[in-house]
Amino acid sequence: MTRALKDILFYGGAVALCAPPLFVFVWMILTGLKTGVQNISYPPEFIFIPTLENFRAVFQQYNFLRYLMNSLIIATLATGFSLVLGLPAAYSIAKYRQGRIGMIILLARMTPFVSYLLPWYIIFRYLKLIDTYTALTLTHLIITLPMVAWLMVAFFESVPAELEDAAMIDGCSRLKSFLIIVLPLVRNGIATSAIMAFIFSWNQFLFSLILSGPQTKTVPVAVYNFISYGKIDWAGIGAAATLIVLPVSVFAFFVRKTIVQGLTMGALKD
């Protein structure tokens, strides 16, 4: 097979994989820039005068800024607690060969998240925690905590044990060695895990739909405000969806090298 043919197959496959999601992304943005009449016209209008009225209405009529702040608070809390709990757990699995704990974490990742929904709802309803940041943060931890722990195991396994032994000979405790020796060496993994946890929490819909309320509604759930009986505000949905996806997409674009480095370096061992 010639080099030219390989390049054609490679780039052709890349275009085939990227074209569908890119088309949906562009269509979503165009929907938010059209009026309601233009969005339901047939055939679709591809040449039109864009308007920002839908984005203005999202903030003025639907209190969207509050929902953005709720998502930011919950995603930040879920990410922070995932790191605080997941890093020691991953270190224990990697250094003490806790295979059973690793299997439990893997099982948590494999279990459908919807299976946790009813027990959590009953517990939070009994404790009067529905529509609170506490309930949503705890449920988001079901997604983010196992992911952080599972990603970090490979990073901790790649740290040479001799470095920790040398630090402990110099008088460091196990905890101090973990904090000042090990964690700086796996900073790429920590950054990658934090970014992935934040994105997963930001995009979470099901738990937020059931457990949130007027005070803690997140942006994925807020899109429901544009759907009512007998009417769907496609322009509003397009504008709201763009506001949800665009910040995370821009953030992921700028940190893409960190994510790639983190996911690949964790697979390498000395």
Question: Model-derived features: where do they sit?
Answer:
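A hydrophobic, multi-pass inner-membrane permease signature
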Residues: M1-D270
